[in-house]
Amino acid sequence: MTAGILCSGLGMAGGPVMRVETGAARAEITALSWDTEGTGREKSNLLRPETAAGLRFRVGGHWHTGAELPTRVETNAAGARTYRITVTPEAEIVWHIESAKGNLALQFSGKGTALGSIETVELSLPFAPGVTPVTALSGDWSAEGTFRLPAIVSAPDFGQMLLTAKSTAAGRQAVHKAGLDGSRAQKFATMVLELAPPQAGVLDTLEFTPHFLPAPAGMVDTALWAQARRGWFNIWQPSARWGDQGNPYSAPAGMLGNNVISDPASCSLWFYADQAFWTPEIAPGISMLPLVRRTIEFWLSGSRLKPSGEVVCYWDFLNFLDANAGPLIASWDYVEASGDLAWLGRNIGKLELVADFLARRDVDGDGLVEATQSGNYGTLQQPARSCAWWDALNCGHKDAYCNAVIYRAWRCLADLEQKLGRGEQKKRYTQLADKLKAAYVPTLLNPETGWLAWWKSADGQLHDYAAPTVNGLAIEYGLVPQERGREILARLRAKMEAVGFTRFDLGVPPMLVPVPRADYIQPHGCGCPKQEDGADTFGQYMNAGITAGHVLHFLAAHYAVGEPGPADKILRAMLERQGRGEFQNGVTDSYPNGIDWTTWDGQPSGYEGYLADSFRFLQAVLLREARFRDRLYRPLAGER
């Protein structure tokens, strides 16, 4: 008997392909992969090396692995394989595996007088995050971190499979629950499905069906959607349960985060929520909104929300201003998309607590929110972090990135207050946003360069690194008048040309000149220069390395000011690269081997390898069109 190999597709170029390899004598799947767009990626096994997908049975309180039990193997003419597993002398489980037209069907039935002795049946799928971080997207998560079907099994850049279950017995739930268990240290993420115990005369079936996300309703120019639809899912990476749950360096199951075995971070929550806002229902019966809500509630509970209203960013790190802004924007995304005013009413007090913490951080009363970090040269020393997602930069005090995000957060909260008919509260957050906007450009515009500096430190210095990201964000959100915004964008494009940057398939660097050592985390942070001028690590990690997600704001700024041409040129180049799966190289957790950041010539300069945040640039496919911009920026309307 030889190993069984099933490879099925639709028989058309670019169509979905499923690859399954089964054990010759043991009841197991040794290789499992797919490619929904027919680009050949199914050749890479999604399962961990030297492991296999298979069954476990609990009998009399003891677990038995199906691959180790006596098994008869049958293969039909089409290559489908059937395993007849003797669990006890009087109980046999029949597992049938077949694939056709890019689908996979796993069928389970039982025979024998002692089927009732089988207490639990589990199907284990040991995925390899180092290949790509496979995870599950379900609209039904329990408080304990399990989920129910239907679900999308999302293999980034391989594609998505709709996982459903059915039974020949009326009312029978073929899969009781499912879960994700992983290890960051050992680099695994295992999906475990608890199947219904076998019942005589009943056939249960699990089906994996290639799934394609339709273009969002109202999209006029759908030509680019085919290039975006598979990667669109890449931003959603519900975590496996990994690490000691009593230690901040861990994650519970089912929280949106960096990747399936990495950290959730409150400063990034709005990235994932914005994308869910556009496509809340990702498949029939599967909404992303409960997962967004679950992650918001995670950050607004327990030790992660301090009595002061400050929100932890990740692990146990505080002093991140965007850690507070993230859940506020995400809450607007959730309520605006779901209409769940009951949830909003129950949580408005916490949202105000979070927002008011930010308001109190305007320590000098000028309207801008000041970070606790001074931002003065040479002050960011490990283990401390900066005030923002850009945690290896020395950004602090009056930070342009954080204040732009806070501006949107306050506008969003004002809109939420209006939904509840809370006029005075709406007025308060509107006034806070108005005051911030009035101070923003006068404080942060560098008259010598004609664009915004990244931050103004406590000693009064402007820290200006020719930043497309920060300037783009401010222009996109209307903090900069449109005419000046066009001038700034033109200056930055000219600067890009002057410094010789041409690799638009990678995106756009977050800054165009080196960050000196004194404005970088010290003494040994990733990308930290040894030279005082920063030239030795220029283009690496947060010293002007490129990460795709934040390119969104530079693109969106062009669309917002009515100059789509330069943005479309960059976006189309990035989409070509995305189609090849080149914005990630699997989970590496090793600096500088992760391609979540690249140098200007495309070499890896990150550590995650896979960073969900990277894929938010795909929202530019929608923000090219005014109707989508109007929806997202509605809380900013009249203030732009």
Located regions from the model:
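Bacterial N-terminal signal peptides
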Residues: M1-S8
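Acidic-aromatic substrate-binding/catalytic surfaces of carbohydrate-active enzymes
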Residues: G15-R84, G130, S138, E144
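Extended, loop-rich substrate-binding clefts of extracytoplasmic carbohydrate-active enzymes
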Residues: R58-L115, A174-M191
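Polysaccharide-binding surfaces and accessory modules of carbohydrate-active proteins
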Residues: I93, S99-K177
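Beta-strand-rich recognition/accessory modules
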Residues: S124-P126, V153-T222
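Substrate-binding groove/exosite segments of carbohydrate-active enzymes
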Residues: G218-G345, E352, A466-E476, P529-R572, ...
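Active-site acid/base region of carbohydrate-active enzymes
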Residues: A223-G246, W270-Y272, I282-W299, R304-K306, ...
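Active-site core of glycosidic bond-cleaving carbohydrate-active enzymes
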Residues: Y272-F277, P290, G349, D356, ...
